[in-house]
Amino acid sequence: MKRIAFVFSTVPHGTAAGREGLDALLATSALTDDLAVFFIADGVFQLLPGQKPDAVLARDYIATFKLLGLYDIEQCWVCAASLRERGLDPQTPFVVEATPLEADALRRELANYDVILRF
């Protein structure tokens, strides 16, 4: 079976991309264990707890990221440069445990996957 990477690169609640990506990730995990999640660019904001989506009349799907462990999704990476560029600390308690990688290492890791789905 092909290795599948899910890349979150957009802010949460601005569009439906993050929620749809999470739904696709959870559905795909029922079919394969060979997948990983990457948070890059504005996608790092998907990891922040305490968001208030009701202020923009959006559904709070961020808490659903906490279910990744129950779905045996353990390969989670976050771009360290993206965190720095947005003033976020890698030590922040994110909703999901994601390993920070510098951009070059993240690209090398992402190259190990056959299919890359970006949300």
From Swiss-Prot:
Record keyword Signal present: no
Places the protein is found: Cytoplasm
InterPro entries to which the protein is assigned, alphabetical: DsrEFH-like, Sulphur_relay_DsrE/F-like, Sulphur_relay_TusC, Sulphur_relay_TusC/DsrF
Signal peptide range in chain numbering: none
Keywords: Cytoplasm, tRNA processing
UniProt GO BP: tRNA processing
NCBIfam families associated with the record: PRK00211.1 (NF001238), sulf_tusC_dsrF (TIGR03010)
Function noted in UniProt: Part of a sulfur-relay system required for 2-thiolation of 5-methylaminomethyl-2-thiouridine (mnm(5)s(2)U) at tRNA wobble positions.
Similarity annotation: Belongs to the DsrF/TusC family.
Subunit structure: Heterohexamer, formed by a dimer of trimers. The hexameric TusBCD complex contains 2 copies each of TusB, TusC and TusD. The TusBCD complex interacts with TusE.
Protein name listed in UniProt: Protein TusC
Organism this protein belongs to: Escherichia coli O1:K1 / APEC
Gene designation per UniProt: tusC
